[in-house]
From Swiss-Prot:
It is an enzyme of class 3 (hydrolase). CDD domains: ArsA. This is ATPase GET3. Zn(2+) binds at residues 281, 284. Keywords: ATP-binding, Cytoplasm, Endoplasmic reticulum, Golgi apparatus, Hydrolase, Metal-binding, Nucleotide-binding, Transport, Zinc. ATPase required for the post-translational delivery of tail-anchored (TA) proteins to the endoplasmic reticulum. Recognizes and selectively binds the transmembrane domain of TA proteins in the cytosol. This complex then targets to the endoplasmic reticulum by membrane-bound receptors GET1 and GET2, where the tail-anchored protein is released for insertion. This process is regulated by ATP binding and hydrolysis. ATP binding drives the homodimer towards the closed dimer state, facilitating recognition of newly synthesized TA membrane proteins. ATP hydrolysis is required for insertion. GO terms for cellular component: GET complex; Golgi apparatus. ATP binds at residues 26-33, 242, 269. Belongs to the arsA ATPase family. It comes from the Eukaryota. Its EC number is 3.6.-.-. It comes from Candida tropicalis (strain ATCC MYA-3404 / T1) (Yeast).
Amino acid sequence: MDFELEPTLEELIKQDTLKWIFVGGKGGVGKTTTSSSIAVQLALQHPEDEFLLISTDPAHNLSDAFCQKFGKDARKVEGLSNLSCMEIDPEAAMSDLQQQAQQYNNDPNDPLKSMMNDMTGSIPGIDEALSFMEVLKHIKNQKVTESDTKDKVSYRTIIFDTAPTGHTLRFLQLPTTLQKLLGKFQQLSGKLGPMMSMLGGGAQGQQDMFAKLNEVQKNVEEVNEQFTNPDLTTFVCVCISEFLSLYETERMIQELMSYKMDVNSIVVNQLLFADDDENPCKRCVARWKMQKKYLDQMAELYEDYHLVKMPLLGSEIRGVDNLKRFSQFLIKPYDPKVDRAIITDLKEQ
């Protein structure tokens, strides 16, 4: 390349058009800290706009990161009035789905109802599907263009703190999968309806279900268009400087590219920067040597990506104040000679 991209997320933070930012990677690499830091910086840099951070990871950590309890409904972050958080609960969504299915009719022998109950209880990846349907609600109500109706919520950007790689890839594959599945289901609906009636299924319940499926299909098509538009959606990969994490990051990037999703930023967490320690321990020096080896490989492999290097901290990053201090290194490269005091002097929560 003729130029080197800035090793920061400053361009992403300042971009005006982004509506959806996904943050993902291998388990234990600091996804929640990174997604929370991105959300905090967005809120700080754009105080006049509203932002929403959503956790789609069944093992929710947003409440721990902000030292504040969040649930399935968006709640304002204390200390940042223009940032809200929520944690999607697949079990609660499953319960709501089953209750909605029961509303169609109360006949326990209805084969359609029995089929729906079996499906919701046994489909592989149902957690991701239910999480996706919850996300659909917010995307449907998100104002994307100025011509959108005024009753839509005008979040400037929604940030997703995703589950570990495998769950996330299944989650992101759902728009395409559902689009194909619903299309085939619609083709069968003309034949399926009379067949269900012959088996004793309620006609009104079937009509309601097919109407609901048509609505879902339209929403899924809209999401597919937005998720593959680089002006509206991007994915930030998070990793640590080790072989397994690097390998999984490359696998994820290849998958994301196959989904036609934009990805041009990688955050590398937990770096020691031992070269600048006055009295480094032998273990730290050895580990930093290993980290530098994989950093060099990343620099060569991802020369056309924003490669952001984040330091290992002396304590956990919890609470808004600590997130503000840590997140500044997403937009300004960390300098161990100048910034070491910032990362070793975090407030205990």
